Amino acid sequence: MTFHPSTDSIIPLPPDIVTNVLGVSYAHVQSSDGGDLYLTPFGVTHFDLLQIENWYEPNWFRSNKRRLEGTSAVHWVPTKELKGKKLDLVVKNCRVGEDVPLATHTLKEFLNTEFNSPWEEFALVMEMRSGAFGPSHIAIRTQEPLGIYVPP
């Protein structure tokens, strides 16, 4: 069974954990391994499921992940089931600061190629979701960005 967001799953947040990056609000909490977990309003509704021990614990992640096609490190992984609920996640490893692999691009065409940070990607997705730009009759339905995990 896949869990869908509902208003009864929203937990109250103390104001000192709420932050804003590039126009996107996040609840910033420390993960069990000492890293940082930034949850969007979509992610806060799944707070318990998104704790890293429920999807990124090394044995669980290694056993349950499926690599998705593409040039970057993107995986599908289910969360562990909690109280009869689970989520199917798409996990993308950040490649900011890495060199672009030349095997996938020609140097001449993509000389100045860079990777977006997760903050930039989430801001762009939220901008598309809001429909603030472009024709008002066109809505772009995207996946709901849940959160950004920064390892210790």
Task: Identify the residue ranges that each predicted region occupies.
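Juxta-kinase regulatory segment immediately upstream of eukaryotic protein kinase catalytic domains
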Residues: 2-65
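Conserved ATP-binding subdomain of kinase catalytic cores across diverse folds
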Residues: 47-152
